[in-house]
Regions:
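Metal-dependent nuclease catalytic cores that hydrolyze phosphodiester bonds in DNA/RNA
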Residues: 1-119, 126-137, 143-144
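Metal-dependent nuclease catalytic cores in nucleic-acid-processing enzymes
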Residues: 75-83, 138-172
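Short, structured patches in soluble enzyme cores that scaffold and shape functional sites
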Residues: 123-124, 169-175
């Protein structure tokens, strides 16, 4: 009798392992830092993570699948922008780690087109979110913390490069 592998289970285990490796590579040894992407989040969330050191719940596999789709879309967009920059002689920052030690914030900005002084953050969304943003009766108001996150990265950029940003954009893409 031929045994049948459980493809979904194998994929879910792979996603969990990949997420764990990603977390370790980015955040291990940096636990004392607040995250740029957590700007504007509930103070209780910050307290439990940074003061009480409560370990968060495991991420649901459905969320891991959405994260993976977002990673793939981010990767494609970033690769296309790097190609654009290469062909046009443009300077670009992609997935750049930033640190603001005076406020203990660390994060990773998505894209800066340096010559244009333009900062972009790419947000993928699921079908439900997309329908709310772009459907028949759209509500284009993004969560406030998206803007605060982008403002944090903008603060770093202006401090680091001494240039005022001319454009700060959140680009929402259906994943």
């Amino acid at each position: 009798m031929v045994s049948v592998i459980d493809i979904q289970k194998i994929y879910e285990q792979w996603l969990k392992k990949r997420n764990e490796l990603h977390y370790k590579s980015r955040y291990d040894g940096h636990e004392q830092w607040f995250h740029g992407s957590a700007s504007g989040m509930c103070m209780r969330k910050h307290y439990f993570q940074h003061v009480a050191k409560v370990k968060p719940n495991a991420v649901d596999v459905n969320a891991l699948r959405l994260f993976r789709l977002g990673d793939l879309v981010h990767g494609d967009i970033q690769e296309s922008l790097m190609e654009y920059a290469s062909l046009n002689g443009a300077r670009i920052l992609i997935e750049r780690e930033i640190q603001l030690p005076e406020v203990n914030v660390r994060g990773f900005l998505d894209v800066v087109m340096v010559e244009d002084n333009a900062l972009y953050d790419i947000k993928t969304c699921n079908a439900w979110k997309w329908k709310g943003l772009f459907g028949r009766t759209p509500d284009t108001n993004l969560p406030e913390n998206y803007y605060l996150q982008l403002g944090t990265y903008g603060w770093w950029y202006e401090k680091e490069y001494g240039n005022k940003l001319k454009n700060i954009t959140i680009k929402t893409i259906q994943g």
